[in-house]
């Protein structure tokens, strides 16, 4: 048994921004009290990981990225009661301690222990479990899943159905839940309503699925890459718009498409400040709601006309789709197993972990929706 011992394994380490991943042998320390060591079997490539590589998100280096994964518990630290070795699990970047105000509030889901910036790259005790040639390597959002083994706090790991296919349900660890929940929980999309989704990547398409599940009658997908349109329509978009096809701003285009009313719900699923304000300006001036789902670049600022809000619009953010992570993830996995929603159309590529750089190239070139790396 490897329990209680240091494990040597392969990991994809990033040494500095704008540089590719290097696959190297690292050492993974045993879990401390209330921590879990996980053998990762599948990990999705999410745009937030790429935001670190591009330098848009500021983190400490060297780092092991990856936060949308599934695996099996290898060993547990002292005091861990909610899972045991051999259990299938999903590590989550959003913990649920169950004790802070946010965890206890019916509408809260951003636990006090969350690391949503500044990013320390360390576990709760202020240290890392990863080392390379004796020097510490940082964890991304306390998950760090582009490695054969990782260690995460128990309150950030969720036990799931033993029969769940890990190479699919790993998407519930971030992308799917984030988009789907933004529509259902954060916006609370109503039946018969009109929605606009800015950005048709994996999270945007999941938002489209959430709008459809909530009963929206019109779902307008917006992207500058028209290759994304057929998949968006397959998943529920009723029409798709490329802003580059118009001389006027996209919010004016959307007002024209809705008889001068604007949409009832808009979702920014890109992470750009200009599209955040465009999404706000696209919704109904009195009862429209716009939700920021895309991760904004570190230290970015927004300037906008407050009259946009004064007339009654609601502008809000959404992290992990508003779900309480430990409560929701097992339910979402069960719903997937019960065919309440599908994940297959979101997964365009599956490739061995060693091809991680190729997977990120597919993302940047707009050729993939989700690439799942298998170990």
Swiss-Prot record:
Record PTM N-acetylserine, positions in chain: 1
Cofactor, free-text remark: Binds 2 Zn(2+) ions per subunit.
Pfam families according to UniProt: ADH_N, ADH_zinc_N
Binding site for NAD(+): 199-204, 223, 228, 293-295, 370
GO terms of molecular function: all-trans-retinol dehydrogenase (NAD+) activity; zinc ion binding
Reactions catalysed, as given in the entry: a primary alcohol + NAD(+) = an aldehyde + NADH + H(+); a secondary alcohol + NAD(+) = a ketone + NADH + H(+)
An annotated GO BP: retinol metabolic process
Residues bound to Zn(2+) 1: 46, 67, 174
Compartments, as annotated in UniProt: Cytoplasm
Its EC number(s): 1.1.1.1
Domain of life: Eukaryota
More details: In U.hardwickii there are two isozymes of alcohol dehydrogenase I.
Subunit structure: Multimeric (with different ratios of monomers).
Identification of the protein by name: Alcohol dehydrogenase 1B
